[in-house]
């Protein structure tokens, strides 16, 4: 390597990549990159790594305030400063011209004979004036780039916060749900324990009574054994008298004390069926409290009649006198409840009994209520329904509703909504201790949601049965 190349390499190695000046108080973090101590101290600290400073080159964490100044490198910088500045390190001529193609300050020899030969060359003073005029524009470009990166960093910071918040809420929900399960299982364990204790007490009491009787007979038998030993050497008359008495008593004891039978203790069998029953009961117990909802008559289509208490709705054969409300359904025989939701978990039940045609679920605040309804999730409808009293359907994005396999004929439908889990599930809740899942929609819900009910046309009385919101009396809660 020639001396000029060596000098150029030294200048590059002794230059701070932050201030583009020769090192001042150089420090070297563990990653091996070197900067001025003041420059590295001015770099913003990490917010998530105990306040460490990232290396501007490789992002490795460092603490510039704890780093020692590299004295050997500092002395080398001082020695390099003795080299004449403002001169070409290759030809040692003044840096008097500027190469516009390579954007580099060079000497006359570089321009006429060196690697810049044939390039567009201007004097250093011309370049200074020209670039001075361009400086404001360059500053604007730099500022725009900085602002763009700041926005990107802000977006990433928000995304990091959202991820942390999502995970935190997930952990909290897991803890809440598992604590609820543990609580229910503890209650179940205590209940089964009491049942077992009661069975044990009854069985033990019966056994102790029988044991007391057997103990009394045992005492008599031992006494008779002693009598028989005594009569063995007695005279004929006395022997016969006592022997007959003992024999009679023995026969009586044997007749009065049959051998003990097997005592059965009535305890639950811990089988797979038992575990399944416990799971079903626990699942029902962990559901949110039943919502006490009422139908909103101001949203009911004009053929619908809502009961005075707001718990029942049916389709009449004549139009009702209703006000013109923007939220009222005008064509379909539908309505929503007065209650609506924007967060949390919710559960409600609707009595359908033997009504042959109906639909229910949830709709978004922005779902269209005028004209023909296009009941799909993309249009803000998450519903299931029944037609002909036997065909159950989920209104998905497919061209035709998805037919559901349903055992029997549900008399009551439960609807479970969870904003955090992004689900709305439908259950056959005819048996409150045995909810049967019918269908689940998965959706990332946003905005306000309304419980939705489609009573359907009365069909000349064939479908005149009402839909009823189920809510038990206070004494049954």
From Swiss-Prot:
CDD domains: Bbox2_TRIM72_C-IV, RING-HC_TRIM72_C-IV, SPRY_PRY_TRIM72. A zinc finger (B box-type) spans 83-124. Zn(2+) 4 binds at residues 97, 100, 114, 117. Gene3D superfamilies: 2.60.120.920, Classic Zinc Finger, Zinc/RING finger domain, C3HC4 (zinc finger). Residues 272-476 form the B30.2/SPRY domain. It catalyses: S-ubiquitinyl-[E2 ubiquitin-conjugating enzyme]-L-cysteine + [acceptor protein]-L-lysine = [E2 ubiquitin-conjugating enzyme]-L-cysteine + N(6)-ubiquitinyl-[acceptor protein]-L-lysine. Pathway: Protein modification; protein ubiquitination. Its EC number is 2.3.2.27. SMART domains: BBOX, PRY, RING, SPRY. It comes from the Eukaryota. Disulfide bond formation at Cys-244 occurs in case of membrane damage that cause the entry of the oxidized milieu of the extracellular space, resulting in homooligomerization. Its main location: membrane. Zn(2+) 1 binds at residues 14, 17, 34, 37. Pfam families: PRY (PF13765), SPRY (PF00622), zf-B_box (PF00643), zf-RING_UBOX (PF13445). It is found in: Cell membrane, Sarcolemma; Cytoplasmic vesicle membrane. Muscle-specific E3 ubiquitin-protein ligase that plays a central role in cell membrane repair by nucleating the assembly of the repair machinery at injury sites. Acts as a sensor of oxidation: upon membrane damage, entry of extracellular oxidative environment results in disulfide bond formation and homooligomerization at the injury site. This oligomerization acts as a nucleation site for recruitment of TRIM72-containing vesicles to the injury site, leading to membrane patch formation. Probably acts upstream of the Ca(2+)-dependent membrane resealing process. Belongs to the TRIM/RBCC family. Homodimer. Homooligomer; disulfide-linked. Oligomerizes on the phospholipid membrane. This is Tripartite motif-containing protein 72. It comes from Xenopus laevis.
């Amino acid at each position: 390597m020639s001396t000029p190349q060596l000098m150029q390499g030294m200048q590059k190695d002794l230059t701070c990549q932050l201030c583009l000046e020769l090192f001042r108080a150089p420090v070297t973090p563990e990653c091996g990159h070197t900067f001025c101590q003041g420059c590295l101290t001015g770099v913003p600290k990490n917010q998530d790594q105990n306040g460490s400073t990232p290396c501007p080159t490789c992002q490795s964490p460092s603490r510039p305030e704890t780093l020692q100044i590299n004295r050997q490198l500092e002395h080398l910088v001082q020695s390099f400063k003795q080299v004449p500045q403002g001169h070409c390190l290759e030809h040692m001529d003044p840096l008097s011209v500027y190469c516009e193609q390579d954007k580099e300050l060079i000497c006359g020899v570089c321009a006429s004979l060196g690697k810049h030969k044939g390039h567009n060359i201007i004097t250093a003073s011309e370049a200074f004036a020209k670039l001075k005029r361009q400086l404001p524009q360059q500053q604007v470009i730099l500022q725009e780039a900085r602002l763009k990166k700041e926005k990107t960093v802000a977006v990433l910071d928000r995304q990091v916060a959202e991820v942390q918040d999502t995970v935190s809420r997930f952990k909290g929900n897991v803890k809440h749900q598992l604590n609820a399960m543990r609580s229910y299982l503890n209650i179940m364990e205590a209940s089964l324990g009491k049942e077992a204790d009661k069975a044990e007490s009854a069985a033990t009491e019966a056994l102790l009574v029988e044991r007391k009787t057997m103990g009394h007979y045992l005492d008599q038998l031992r006494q008779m054994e002693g009598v028989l030993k005594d009569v063995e050497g007695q005279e004929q008359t006395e022997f016969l008298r006592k022997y007959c008495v003992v024999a009679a008593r023995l026969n009586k004891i044997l007749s009065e004390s049959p051998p003990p039978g097997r005592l059965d203790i009535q305890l639950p069998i811990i089988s797979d069926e038992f575990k399944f029953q416990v799971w079903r009961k626990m699942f029902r117990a962990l559901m949110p409290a039943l919502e006490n909802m009422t139908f909103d008559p101001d949203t009911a289509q004009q053929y619908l009649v809502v009961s005075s208490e707001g718990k029942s709705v049916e389709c009449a054969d004549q139009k009702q006198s209703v006000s013109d409300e923007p939220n009222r359904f005008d064509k379909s025989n539908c309505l929503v409840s007065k209650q609506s939701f924007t967060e949390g978990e919710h559960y409600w039940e609707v009595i359908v009994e033997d009504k042959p045609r109906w639909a229910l679920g949830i709709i978004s605040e922005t779902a269209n209520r005028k004209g023909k309804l296009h009941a799909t999730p993309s249009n803000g409808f998450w519903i299931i329904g029944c037609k002909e009293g036997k065909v159950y359907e989920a209104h998905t994005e497919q061209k035709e509703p998805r037919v559901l396999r349903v055992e029997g004929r549900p008399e009551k439908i439960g609807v479970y909504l969870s904003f955090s889990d992004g689900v709305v599930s439908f259950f056959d809740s005819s048996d409150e201790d045995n909810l049967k899942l019918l269908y689940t929609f998965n959706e990332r819900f946003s905005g306000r949601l309304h419980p939705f009910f489609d009573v359907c046309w009365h069909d000349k009385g064939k479908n005149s049965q009402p839909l009823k919101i189920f809510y038990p009396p206070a004494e049954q809660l």
